[in-house]
């Protein structure tokens, strides 16, 4: 739900802000071994390794293209708490990779702010009009996304969009602070520009994942 309505549009907005695609996302990335070598090889011990790989490839002078194909993915039977911890991990990944731009996302929750405005203003006419306009724009954006990604089954969930937006704001706030993420049954601490270390019993240790350098890529 959040991936279709928020993540895909945010990736396209990032393309506009950067002037080109300067990142990579997703479980499926395609490139040549020579390009990978020029970018410094695979570096797994980093939060958002897919994003970072695309960033380094762009810095090496190559162009990155978003595929016109959308791969379907299923996170399985997650509990609500598992979904929240996963999205907090994604939020902190974005924060460490995009820096101060992450905090600019505060303006992206107009639907939530309008509902709060209604309560604070006592429901005056101009607040009602502003709220209706904001929600019309939001639903129009969502319907466009549904058509573009060909996901008609999500139409039956449109009623939950207000709840999703409130949840998204909470996750954004949570992701704005802290250096710890939960991934595959363990806590990882993020340091520097995104290097991850395993955290256990109050201590941190290097994540035992080796990078693949240029010499190892044939």
Regions found by a protein language model. Give the residues of each.
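Long helical/loop segments within the catalytic core of UDP-sugar-dependent glycosyltransferases
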Residues: 1-40, 84-85, 91, 157-168, ...
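Catalytic donor/gating beta->alpha subdomain of glycosyltransferases that bind UDP-sugars
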Residues: 1-8, 34-37, 41-102, 193
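Short coil/turn segments at secondary-structure boundaries
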Residues: 13-15, 100-105
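Membrane-proximal intrinsically disordered regions of secretory-pathway and membrane-system proteins
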Residues: 62, 190-218
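Membrane-embedded multi-pass helical conduit in multi-pass membrane proteins
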Residues: 105-182
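A broadly conserved detector of short glycine/acidic/proline-rich loop/turn motifs that flank catalytic sites
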Residues: 134, 141, 187, 194, ...
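A general beta-strand register signal
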Residues: 182-185, 189
């Amino acid at each position: 739900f959040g991936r279709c309505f928020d993540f895909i549009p945010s990736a396209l907005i990032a393309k506009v802000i950067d002037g080109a695609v300067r990142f990579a996302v997703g479980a499926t990335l395609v490139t040549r071994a020579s390009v990978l070598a020029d970018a410094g090889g695979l570096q797994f011990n980093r939060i958002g390794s897919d994003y970072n790989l695309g960033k380094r490839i762009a810095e090496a002078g190559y162009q990155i293209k978003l595929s016109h194909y959308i791969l379907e993915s299923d996170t399985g039977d997650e509990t609500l708490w598992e979904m929240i911890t996963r999205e907090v991990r994604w939020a902190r990944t974005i924060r460490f990779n995009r820096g101060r731009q992450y905090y600019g996302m505060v303006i992206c929750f107009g639907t939530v702010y309008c509902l709060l405005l209604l309560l604070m203003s006592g429901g005056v006419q101009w607040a009602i009009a502003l709220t209706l306009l904001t929600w019309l724009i939001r639903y129009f954006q969502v319907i466009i996304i549904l058509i573009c990604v060909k996901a008609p089954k999500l139409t039956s969930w449109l009623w939950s969009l207000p709840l999703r937006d409130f949840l998204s704001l909470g996750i954004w706030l949570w992701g704005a602070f802290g250096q710890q993420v939960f991934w595959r049954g363990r806590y990882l601490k993020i340091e520097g520009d995104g290097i991850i270390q395993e955290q256990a019993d109050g201590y941190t240790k290097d994540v035992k994942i080796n990078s693949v350098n240029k010499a190892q890529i044939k």
